[in-house]
Regions:
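Function-dense linear segments that define catalytic or interfacial modules
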Residues: 1-21, 130-223
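Flexible, glycine/charged-enriched surface loops at secondary-structure junctions
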Residues: 2-8, 46-59, 67-79, 220-223
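Charged, amphipathic alpha-helical regulatory modules used
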Residues: 18-26, 55
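Short alpha-helix boundary/capping segments
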Residues: 23-31, 182
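Generic recognition of stable, solvent-exposed alpha-helical segments in well-folded globular domains
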Residues: 30, 34, 38, 54, ...
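Conserved, charged catalytic cores of large soluble enzymes
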Residues: 30, 34-43, 62-161
Length: 223
């Protein structure tokens, strides 16, 4: 019974207009208009009930699809889903790339919160194989918590104990490529170093150290 609000995109920079700061050309208002219509259809179809995980997933993927600057994609996603969520398991089965092309914007993985039995684990891997897309992948949430517990035993506090920098009881996730353990709403500090021909071990160490500091600092730049 809800109403869909109207929107005015007349002040959005027109398609093809130059971007002075980032370079490239503007995408124009059409992608944003497509997103609003896409989300509205899902909201209408789900009237009277909560959104399903797959519906939330599709909306977030559609948002990521339009987040571009100068024609360059500026988004990266991963969806961690429950073991018993069949719709997320089969999100990239069949001709999803024709019917739900926005799903290409996210990696999908099941999040194991406890060690599964062999049969359950093998069924998940068979589903991954049958999809021909390499997804849903597997993220071991239990292992992430165990790793955090080990990190808390690295730095002594001078009183016979250790400095507890992370709470091992937190529900940890990961960045879109699953290299980094993250808390809820925490930002990725992933950085990249360019190796030049003249680099040696010492110069590479310096680059990695600088990138680590910069990446950690940049991950805090949010309100």
């Amino acid at each position: 019974t809800g109403q869909i609000p109207k929107w005015d995109l007349s002040k959005v920079r027109g398609a093809g207009e130059p971007l002075k700061t980032f370079g490239g050309r503007a995408s124009g208002p059409q992608p944003l208009d497509d997103l609003f219509h896409f989300a509205s259809r899902i909201f209408q179809d789900s009237a009277g009930r909560k959104l399903k995980p797959i519906e939330c997933h599709d909306i977030v993927c559609k948002i990521a699809e339009i987040v571009v600057v100068g024609g360059v994609r500026r988004s990266a996603l991963i969806s961690l889903s429950d073991l018993n969520d069949r719709e997320m398991r089969f999100a990239k089965h069949g001709e999803w790339y024709k019917l739900n092309v926005q799903r290409a914007l996210a990696n999908n993985s099941v999040n194991y919160k406890e060690r599964p039995d062999v049969g359950t684990y093998m069924r998940e891997w068979l589903s991954l194989y049958d999809s021909k897309s390499g997804e849903r992948g597997v993220y071991n949430g239990v292992s992430a918590k165990n790793q955090v517990a080990l990190l808390n035993e690295r730095e002594k506090d001078g009183n016979g104990g250790y400095v507890k920098r992370r709470e091992p009881r937190d529900d940890f996730g990961t960045n879109p490529c699953s290299e980094i353990i993250l808390r809820s709403r925490e930002f990725c500090n992933l950085s990249e170093c360019v190796v030049r021909r003249h680099d040696d071990v010492e110069s590479l160490k310096k680059k990695v150290r600088s990138a680590t500091i910069l990446g950690t600092f940049q991950s805090t730049l949010t309100n």
